[in-house]
Amino acid sequence: MSNIQEALKTLLVQKNLTDDMAQKVMNDIMDGKVSDPEIAAYLMGLAAKKEAVSEIVGSARAMIDHAKTIPSEFEAMDIVGTGGDLSGTFNISTTASFIVAGAGVPVVKHGNRAASSKSGTADALEALGVTIDLTPEQATDVLANAGQTFLFARSFHPAMKYVGSIRKSLGFRTIFNILGPLTNPTRPRTMLVGVYTKELLVPLANVLSELGVQEAILVHGQDGLDEVTLTTKTDLAILSNGHIREATFDPQDYGFDYVSIESLQGGTPIENAKITEHILAGKITGPMADTAILNAALALFIAKKAQSIDAAIQLARETLINGTALGQLGALRSSSRAVTA
């Protein structure tokens, strides 16, 4: 009996797969050894049962093993979200990543084009003039030169070609929506992860711990955003050296007023790129800038660049005021172009 057949029989009776079995099945999928109908049945079986931690861990390990690797001498972090919140906001985590890198924390952002929104990370960066399709060597050079780089998921996970059309035809979230933020080829040990549903916060914190992540904050806005939100409170799962605790973040505790979700709305990649650049340049203040600051602050805090959330918020603000966040965009733009010239 093949791995996929054994897995399907297990899923048929609503039992969880071990991480070893999930890894074997994903290895077979990534090697092109599983038929489209079997892949579809497998994804449906996992989704119907709800993916277990063991299944996510095993699948993530297989995906990372099949990814192009990028060796790095830097201790870089990732700021990433699952997407799928259908909110239509501007590219919050992408904007925050420039603030974080500008504050001196190297960032390796791993992302893709939009799936359920108008503008994914790759779309926005491309509209900002950043060259997104880099080889591992080029991405490493950009990180060394700019303190920040971008790994285009489509390029670094070539084996995903075996599931792309199936995912589109199914039309619902699958385990791959969850795996995206977990499969950065650099295996960062520090992360800020946005999650589209509260029920995944603690399970994904456990997954990250199993994958070797040491410090992470997983966030889900109570308004549904897979970001730290400014419209209401944000639910958190905080991972620190294998220990996980839940918390709630309220921006009102830090002097911010709640805003409407409409005030955070973005648009096309070009429109979102303009929003990001204007926030970094200080031309946009208010709800959008404050939301980017809050997300950057939690990233700076978990990266131990600031000793408290208050100090992290102040550092994020200073990075905008003194121009280093905007300079970070310029550095990423010029460095990514230079290595591909």
UniProtKB/Swiss-Prot annotation:
One GO process term, biological-process aspect: L-tryptophan biosynthetic process
UniProt-annotated binding residues for anthranilate 2: R167
Binding site for anthranilate 1: G81, N112
Residues involved in Mg(2+) 1 binding: S93, E227
Organism superkingdom: Bacteria
Tagged with keyword Metal-binding: yes
Binding site for 5-phospho-alpha-D-ribose 1-diphosphate: 81, 84-85, 89, 91-94, 109-117, 121
Keywords: Amino-acid biosynthesis, Aromatic amino acid biosynthesis, Glycosyltransferase, Magnesium, Metal-binding, Transferase, Tryptophan biosynthesis
S-S bonds: none
EC number(s) stated in the UniProt entry for this protein: 2.4.2.18
Binding annotation for Mg(2+) 2: D226, E227
Cofactor note: Binds 2 magnesium ions per monomer.
Cofactor(s) in the UniProt record: Mg(2+)
Alphabetical list of HAMAP family matching this protein: TrpD
Family: Belongs to the anthranilate phosphoribosyltransferase family.
Assembly notes: Homodimer.
Stated name of the protein: Anthranilate phosphoribosyltransferase
The organism of origin for this protein: Leuconostoc mesenteroides subsp. mesenteroides (strain ATCC 8293 / DSM 20343 / BCRC 11652 / CCM 1803 / JCM 6124 / NCDO 523 / NBRC 100496 / NCIMB 8023 / NCTC 12954 / NRRL B-1118 / 37Y)
